[in-house]
């Protein structure tokens, strides 16, 4: 017998922060009659999704991975950025077994140590301080051939800001007496997560064969040439950097390759291209037999040594719902599917018992400002059908538009993205009302509320540290002030009448009026 459910839905509006300054604020300038009405009629407030409140350094902007881990776990989770930075400052990093083994294996084989990753101070997918520590450690252990393959940012940092980083590493290698920048390429290619293998293949061929669209004798020169081609950091074409003899550095048998990104979602595809024996994303001309190490755990099927394995999170929202015999649905587009599943479940790949998942393909466009609505209509069609089925106790949905279009820096497109999401929310709220359901509307971090850098005048493509909305569309209630993302899971459990496990240190924010 099927039991009719009155679901509670958590709608996560990715990249949707609150900013009082209305200048180039796409969320403010968007026509959002649905959210305006909900804010007027229902209890609402603002909660924190950045810095110490989500386990990041004070003042550090939030991001989707961190946001969803905190949302799903119901506690502040000490993030990889903070954890690894602490290991470096405590001098534990330089004796990390996985990293030391990789460096030593290359030295003993007469090979090179290749270090790849997002060379950025952004702190979202990586941090250049970690990459510097790795370069220093490799040379200190005796490596004389150290090659940095730099993926350029311009997304979590200003669009043209890589010069300072590249110059710093040129100086660093000069100081160390060994090593150099061996290649540069934009993250658009190297860090794709939407199965655009034609992009990833360019980074793979650059590192394994030195196959590049351009070749230069200096990384900064290569970057300046890219700017002259009107390529921002994120989109810099594959560029090989030669040594004084005009030779490129390629990954060879016996070498070590250390991937310094700590965030998993954009590290998975290129990692699989290097290590999976049955990889079929593109034709690999060469597959070097090398020692590959990942900085953190990227996925269950990636079996390379891990320098900093994931810390086990127990009694996340998904696990509690499973243990209490509850049903749940996770739904999003490709771009944020991993976030409502893997990250929301505290880094667990497999679904919990009673957990269904729906993946909606994100549109195949070069950048999402070309289709700011993305696949929101199709996503909402499936979501409304799931609500009407009365099959689920809890539904977790992510609308990626504010973040993905916000990252393009295109203000007009970001406005359209917000308007598309608002229309979809109207359909979802209506469907929930028909079945007696309720919903919480919030976000994981800010982005679209700031589309220009007030200091430089450049497009602002990064996340922000702004507070995010928290709206309860349901029974008459009050909402506590000063909340944070880790308070959301306990709030949901309380709303459905379940006790909150001790591991969840967050506090329920919603108090139903009797």
Swiss-Prot record:
Active-site residues annotated for this sequence: 64
Keyword terms of this UniProt record: Glycolysis, Isomerase, Manganese, Metal-binding
Cofactor: Mn(2+)
GO molecular function: manganese ion binding; phosphoglycerate mutase activity
Residues the record lists as binding Mn(2+) 1: 403, 407, 463
Domain of life: Bacteria
Reactions the enzyme catalyzes: (2R)-2-phosphoglycerate = (2R)-3-phosphoglycerate
Entry keyword annotation includes DNA-binding: no
One GO biological process term: glucose catabolic process
Cofactor note: Binds 2 manganese ions per subunit.
Family per similarity comment: Belongs to the BPG-independent phosphoglycerate mutase family.
SUBUNIT field: Monomer.
Annotated function: Catalyzes the interconversion of 2-phosphoglycerate and 3-phosphoglycerate.
Protein's name according to its UniProt entry: 2,3-bisphosphoglycerate-independent phosphoglycerate mutase
Organism, as annotated: Shewanella putrefaciens (strain CN-32 / ATCC BAA-453)
Species lineage: Bacteria, Pseudomonadati, Pseudomonadota, Gammaproteobacteria, Alteromonadales
Originating gene: gpmI
């Amino acid at each position: 017998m099927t039991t009719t459910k009155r679901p509670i839905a958590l709608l996560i509006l990715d990249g949707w922060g609150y900013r009082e300054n209305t200048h180039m604020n796409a969320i403010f300038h968007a026509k959002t009659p649905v959210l305006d009405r909900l804010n007027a009629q229902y209890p609402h407030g603002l909660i924190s999704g950045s810095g110490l409140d989500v386990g990041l350094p004070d003042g550090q902007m939030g991001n989707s991975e961190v946001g969803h881990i905190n949302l799903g776990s119901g506690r502040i989770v000490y993030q990889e950025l903070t954890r690894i930075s602490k290991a470096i400052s405590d001098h534990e990093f330089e004796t990390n077994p996985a990293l030391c083994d990789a460096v030593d294996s290359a030295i003993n084989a007469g090979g090179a140590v290749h270090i790849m990753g997002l060379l950025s101070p952004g702190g979202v997918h990586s941090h250049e301080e970690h990459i510097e520590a790795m370069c220093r450690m490799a040379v200190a252990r005796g490596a004389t051939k150290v090659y940095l393959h730099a993926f350029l940012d311009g997304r979590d940092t200003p669009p043209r800001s890589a010069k300072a980083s590249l110059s710093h590493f040129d100086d660093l290698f000069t100081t160390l007496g060994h090593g150099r920048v061996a290649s540069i390429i934009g993250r658009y290619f190297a860090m794709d997560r939407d199965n655009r293998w034609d992009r990833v293949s360019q980074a793979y061929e650059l590192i394994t064969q030195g196959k590049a669209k351009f070749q230069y004798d200096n990384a900064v020169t290569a970057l300046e040439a890219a700017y002259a081609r009107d390529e921002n950091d994120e989109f810099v074409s594959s560029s090989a950097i030669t040594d004084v003899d005009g030779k490129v550095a390629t990954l060879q048998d016996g070498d070590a390759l250390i991937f310094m990104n700590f965030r998993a979602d954009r590290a998975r595809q290129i990692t699989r291209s290097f290590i999976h024996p049955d990889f079929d994303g593109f034709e690999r001309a060469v597959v070097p037999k090398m020692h590959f190490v990942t900085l953190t755990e990227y996925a269950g099927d990636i079996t390379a040594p891990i320098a900093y394995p994931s810390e086990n999170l127990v009694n996340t929202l998904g696990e509690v719902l499973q243990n209490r015999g509850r049903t749940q649905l996770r739904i999003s587009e490709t771009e944020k599917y991993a976030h409502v599943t893997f990250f929301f479940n505290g880094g667990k790949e497999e679904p919990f018992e009673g957990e269904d998942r729906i993946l909606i393909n994100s549109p195949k466009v070069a950048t999402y400002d070309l289709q700011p609505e993305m696949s929101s209509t199709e996503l909402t069609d499936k979501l409304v059908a799931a609500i009407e089925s009365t099959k689920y106790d809890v539904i977790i949905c992510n609308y990626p538009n504010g973040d993905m279009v916000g990252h393009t820096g295109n203000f007009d497109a970001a406005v359209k993205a917000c308007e598309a999401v608002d229309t979809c929310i109207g359909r979802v709220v209506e469907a929930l009302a028909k079945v007696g359901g309720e919903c919480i509307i919030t976000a994981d971090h800010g982005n679209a509320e700031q589309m220009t850098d007030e200091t430089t005048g450049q497009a602002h493509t990064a996340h922000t540290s702004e507070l995010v909305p928290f709206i309860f569309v349901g029974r008459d209630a009050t909402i506590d002030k000063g909340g944070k993302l880790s308070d959301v899971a306990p709030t949901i459990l309380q709303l459905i009448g379940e006790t909150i496990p001790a591991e969840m240190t967050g506090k329920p924010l919603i108090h139903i009026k009797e």
